[in-house]
C-alpha cells in the first residue's frame, strides 16, 4: 500500500525547530517520548486536562497522557487545539500588520511577530509572508521556460523543492510544489509536455500565432480607433536597419547561444547572463555606429518600412519595460521601395529571441502581459500622444495623410483628411499615400498628472506655428547627428484643427504641426515669421465654445480655510466635540434688541445717551422694587409703567388716574367687592398713592431734563395687555376660584384681613 503524504498539520507536529522560541527547549530534550500522530482520544483528553488545570503546569498534564512529554502537550495545544487560534483566511488588516512587523523585526523572528497578532502563530505568519506578502515573490503566470527548469530539476533532484526554488528567483518552494502537483505532473506524464516531439510543434504554434497577431491588430486599429497606422504589433525584438549582413549572423548566433545556455541546467547561469548582456550591448553599439555612418552618407534615402528599436543604453534591464517606436517615411516619387532604400533589416527570428528572453525573470512578466492582450497594447488611443501639452478640447481623430514631395526639396506640401463630427472632410492632393506619423510614446504607460500637462499661455501676437518653426527647422539641420529622423508629437490635434483650414498649403517657412519636413535643405531662421491669424471673435465656432470660468467664481458661499479646518479637526480629535458656552445676559440683551429692531423697524426700548444719568435714576427706582411681596402691582410700579407708555407731556392728573385705574385692574374682584365698605381706608391709600405719584413725577422731570428720551408706543399690543391685566381665560378662572375661596373665608370670620405691603 502506498504511503499517504503528510498534511501540513502533521508536518507541524514533527518540525519543532521552525520556531525560534522552541530551540532552547529542544536542546535540553535528549529524547522525544513518542513521535506518533496524535489520536482523537488524546486530543479530547488534552482539552479536558487544560480546561481543568490551565496552561501553567504542562508536566502535570503530561503525566496523565501516556508516552507524551510536557513539550509535546504544550506544542499540540498552542499550535493545534487552542480554540483562540484563527485558521481562516487572512484579512487586509492582518496582512498590513505582518508587513509592518517584518519591516521592524526582520523576516526571521516569527514568534515575536506572532505575539502582535492575536490568534496567529509563527508558522502562519512565516508562510503568509513567504508565499504571499513578500514583494520579491512573483505572482504572474508560469512560463514555458520556468516549466522546463522545474522539469529538468525534478528529474535530477526529485521533491527537493527548496533546492529547485534556488534555480527560479522570485518563486517559492511552496508555489513550485503546488504548480508541479496541480498542473505540471499531469501534463508531463499524460500529455507528453516538454518532450522532444511537442517542442517543435509548440514552437510552430507560437510562430503561427505571432504571424497572425499583426493582421488582427490592423483590423482593430482601422475599424475601432479610426487610425490608419500600419505598425507591426508583435512583441518587440531587435530590428535594426543596417547594410551589413554580418550583423544578422552575429545576432542570430548570440540568440542561439542564449537559447542553448538556458535550456541546459547550468549552475553558471548568472555568469552567462552577464556575458549575454555584454554581447548584446556590443552588437547594438556596432549596429548604431554603422547605421549613423550610412545615414550621414545618404540622408534623403530613408527606410520605407517601419522599424522598431530599443533606444535605451542598458538593453538587458529595460527591454521589457521601455519601448520607443520610431517611424520613418519613404520618398514617394513613383519609384519602388528597393530603389530608394538600399538598407537591409536585421530581423532576428522571433521564437529564438523570445524563448531566450523568457528565461530571464525580468522579461517574462512583461512579455506575458503583451501576449495576453495584444489588442489593448496595440490600441494607440490608450496612450498619451503628447507629454507636455494637454488639449483643452477633445482631439478629432485623424484618418489618412498624403505627402507630396518635390524633387528639389524646396517645398513639402501636407494635406490631411480628418473626421470631424462624424463627417469626412477631404482635402487630399497627390498620387502616393503615406502614413500620418502619429508616433505614440510608449515609454510611459500612464498619463502624467494634469499639473505637468498644463499648456503655457501664448504671448500676445504669437501663434503656435511661430513657436514650432525654430524647433522643426533645427531638427532638420541636426538630423544627421540623431539616430531617428522623426520626433514625438509636440502638439495637441485640436490645436492643429483650430489653426489650419482644410486647403492650407505648408512649406519650409510655414511647416506643419505633425512631423519633421522630409527634406534635406538646411535653413536658418533668425526672425520668427508671424502668420496671419483670424481674430477669435470672427471664427466660425466662436459662439459655440464654452467660456472659461474660474473655479473661484463658481462658489459664492464663504468657505472655511483649509488650515482652520485642520486646526478645528485636531482640536475635536484631542478634546472632543466643541460645546456652545452660555453668554452673559448683557450680550443676549443686545442681540435680542438687534433682532427686534430688524424685524419691527423701530427700537421699542429706551435709547440711552447719557449712561451715568440713566444709572443714577435706575438706582433710585430699584430701591422701591425690592419691597414687592404680592401679586398686586403697587402704585410706584404702575407710575413707572405709565411713564414708559405715555409721553412726558401728559399732566399729573392723567398719570395719577391711569396709575389708580391700572392698580384696580390687577386687584381681585372679590377683594374689591369686600372692601367697598372700607372707603376711608381706600381714600387714605389713594392719598398716599397721589403723594407717591407726585414724588415720582418730580424724579421723572429731573431725568427728562438730562436728555433721556422716551419713545411712543405706536400701536398697543392687546394680547400683551390681556396677559398683563389678567384678562386671559385661565387667569379669569383663577380669579373666580380665588373669589369663591375668599367668600367662604369671610363668611366664617367677621374680622377683615388687612393687606400688608
Swiss-Prot record:
Region of interest (Disordered), ranges: 187-209
Keywords annotated in UniProt: Activator, DNA-binding, Nucleus, Repeat, Transcription, Transcription regulation
A single GO BP: positive regulation of transcription by RNA polymerase II
Keyword presence, DNA-binding: yes
GO annotation, cellular component aspect: nucleus
Pfam family, one: Myb_DNA-binding
DNA-binding region, residue range(s): 58-81, 110-133, 161-184
PROSITE patterns, per the entry: HTH_MYB (PS51294)
SMART domains cross-referenced by the UniProt entry: SANT
Major localization class: nucleus
Region (Transcriptional activation domain): 235-300
MF terms (GO), sorted A to Z: DNA-binding transcription factor activity, RNA polymerase II-specific; RNA polymerase II cis-regulatory region sequence-specific DNA binding
Region (Negative regulatory domain): 303-558
Subcellular location: Nucleus
Subunit structure of this chain's protein: Component of the DREAM complex.
Entry function: Strong transcriptional activator; DNA-binding protein that specifically recognize the sequence 5'-YAAC[GT]G-3'. Could have a role in the proliferation and/or differentiation of neurogenic, spermatogenic and B-lymphoid cells.
Protein name as annotated: Myb-related protein A
Originating organism: Gallus gallus (Chicken)
Amino acid at each position: 500500500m502506498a504511503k499517504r503524504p503528510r498534511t501540513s498539520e502533521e508536518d507541524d507536529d514533527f518540525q519543532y525547530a521552525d520556531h525560534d522560541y522552541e530551540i532552547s527547549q529542544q536542546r535540553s530534550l535528549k529524547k522525544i517520548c513518542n513521535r506518533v500522530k496524535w489520536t482523537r482520544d488524546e486530543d479530547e483528553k488534552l482539552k479536558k486536562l487544560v480546561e481543568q488545570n490551565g496552561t501553567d503546569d504542562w508536566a502535570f498534564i503530561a503525566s496523565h497522557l501516556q508516552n507524551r512529554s510536557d513539550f509535546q502537550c504544550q506544542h499540540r495545544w498552542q499550535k493545534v487545539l487552542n480554540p483562540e487560534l484563527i485558521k481562516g483566511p487572512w484579512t487586509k488588516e492582518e496582512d498590513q500588520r505582518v508587513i509592518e512587523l517584518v519591516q521592524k523585526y526582520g523576516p526571521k523572528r516569527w514568534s515575536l511577530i506572532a505575539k502582535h497578532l492575536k490568534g496567529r502563530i509563527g508558522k502562519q505568519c512565516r508562510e503568509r509572508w513567504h508565499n504571499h506578502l513578500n514583494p520579491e515573490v512573483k505572482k504572474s503566470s508560469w512560463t514555458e521556460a520556468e516549466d522546463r527548469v522545474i522539469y529538468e530539476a525534478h528529474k535530477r533532484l526529485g521533491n527537493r523543492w527548496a533546492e529547485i526554488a534556488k534555480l527560479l528567483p522570485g518563486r517559492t518552494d511552496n508555489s513550485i510544489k503546488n504548480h508541479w502537483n496541480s498542473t505540471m505532473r499531469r501534463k508531463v506524464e499524460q500529455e507528453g509536455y516538454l518532450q522532444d516531439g511537442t517542442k517543435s510543434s509548440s514552437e510552430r504554434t507560437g510562430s503561427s500565432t505571432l504571424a497572425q497577431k499583426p493582421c488582427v491588430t490592423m483590423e482593430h486599429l482601422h475599424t475601432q480607433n479610426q487610425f490608419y497606422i500600419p505598425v507591426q504589433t508583435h512583441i518587440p525584438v531587435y530590428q535594426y536597419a543596417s547594410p551589413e549582413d554580418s550583423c544578422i549572423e552575429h545576432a542570430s548566433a548570440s540568440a542561439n547561444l542564449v537559447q542553448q545556455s538556458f535550456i541546459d541546467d547550468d549552475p553558471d547561469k548568472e555568469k552567462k547572463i552577464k556575458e549575454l548582456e555584454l554581447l548584446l550591448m556590443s552588437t547594438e553599439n556596432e549596429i548604431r555606429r554603422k547605421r549613423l555612418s550610412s545615414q550621414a552618407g545618404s540622408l534623403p534615402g530613408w527606410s520605407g518600412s517601419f522599424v522598431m528599436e530599443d533606444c535605451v543604453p542598458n538593453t538587458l534591464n529595460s527591454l521589457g519595460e521601455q519601448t520607443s517606436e520610431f517611424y520613418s517615411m519613404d520618398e514617394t516619387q513613383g519609384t519602388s521601395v528597393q530603389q530608394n532604400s538600399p538598407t537591409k533589416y536585421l530581423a532576428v527570428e522571433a521564437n529564438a529571441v523570445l524563448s531566450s528572453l523568457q528565461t530571464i525573470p525580468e522579461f517574462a512578466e512583461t512579455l506575458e502581459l503583451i501576449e495576453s492582450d495584444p489588442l489593448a497594447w496595440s490600441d494607440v488611443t490608450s496612450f498619451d500622444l503628447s507629454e507636455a501639452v494637454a488639449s483643452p478640447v477633445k482631439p478629432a481623430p485623424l484618418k489618412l495623410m498624403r505627402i507630396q514631395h518635390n524633387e528639389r526639396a524646396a517645398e513639402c506640401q501636407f494635406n490631411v483628411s480628418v473626421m470631424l463630427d462624424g463627417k469626412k472632410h477631404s482635402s487630399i492632393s497627390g498620387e502616393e499615400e503615406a502614413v500620418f506619423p502619429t508616433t505614440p510614446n510608449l515609454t510611459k504607460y500612464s498619463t502624467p498628472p494634469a499639473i505637468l500637462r498644463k499648456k503655457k499661455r501664448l504671448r500676445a501676437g504669437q501663434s503656435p506655428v511661430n513657436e514650432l518653426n525654430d524647433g522643426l527647422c533645427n531638427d532638420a539641420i541636426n538630423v544627421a547627428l540623431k539616430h531617428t529622423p522623426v520626433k514625438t508629437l509636440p502638439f495637441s490635434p485640436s490645436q492643429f484643427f483650430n489653426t489650419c483650414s482644410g486647403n492650407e498649403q505648408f512649406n519650409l517657412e510655414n511647416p506643419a504641426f505633425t512631423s519633421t519636413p522630409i527634406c534635406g535643405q538646411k535653413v536658418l531662421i533668425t526672425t520668427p515669421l508671424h502668420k496671419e491669424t483670424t481674430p477669435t471673435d470672427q471664427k466660425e465656432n466662436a459662439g459655440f465654445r464654452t467660456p472659461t470660468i474660474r473655479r473661484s467664481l463658481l462658489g459664492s458661499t464663504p468657505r472655511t480655510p483649509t488650515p482652520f479646518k485642520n486646526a478645528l479637526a485636531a482640536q475635536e480629535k484631542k478634546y472632543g466635540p466643541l460645546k456652545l458656552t452660555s453668554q452673559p445676559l448683557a450680550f443676549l440683551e443686545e442681540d435680542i434688541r438687534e433682532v427686534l429692531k430688524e424685524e419691527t423697524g423701530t427700537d421699542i426700548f429706551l435709547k440711552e445717551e447719557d449712561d451715568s444719568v440713566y444709572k443714577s435714576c435706575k438706582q433710585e427706582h430699584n430701591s422701591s422694587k425690592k419691597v414687592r411681596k404680592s401679586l398686586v402691582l403697587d402704585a410706584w410700579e404702575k407710575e413707572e409703567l405709565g411713564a414708559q407708555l405715555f409721553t412726558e407731556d401728559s399732566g399729573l392728573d392723567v398719570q395719577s388716574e391711569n396709575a389708580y385705574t391700572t392698580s384696580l385692574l390687577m386687584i381681585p374682584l372679590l377683594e374689591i367687592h369686600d372692601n367697598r365698605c372700607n372707603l376711608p381706608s381706600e381714600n387714605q391709600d389713594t392719598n398716599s398713592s397721589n403723594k407717591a405719584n407726585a414724588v415720582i413725577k418730580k424724579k421723572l422731570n429731573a431725568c427728562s431734563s438730562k436728555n433721556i428720551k422716551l419713545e411712543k408706543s405706536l400701536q398697543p399690543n392687546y394680547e400683551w395687555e390681556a396677559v398683563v391685566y389678567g384678562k386671559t381665560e385661565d387667569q379669569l378662572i383663577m380669579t373666580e376660584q380665588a373669589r369663591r375661596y375668599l367668600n367662604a373665608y369671610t363668611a366664617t370670620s367677621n374680622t377683615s384681613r388687612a393687606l400688608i405691603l
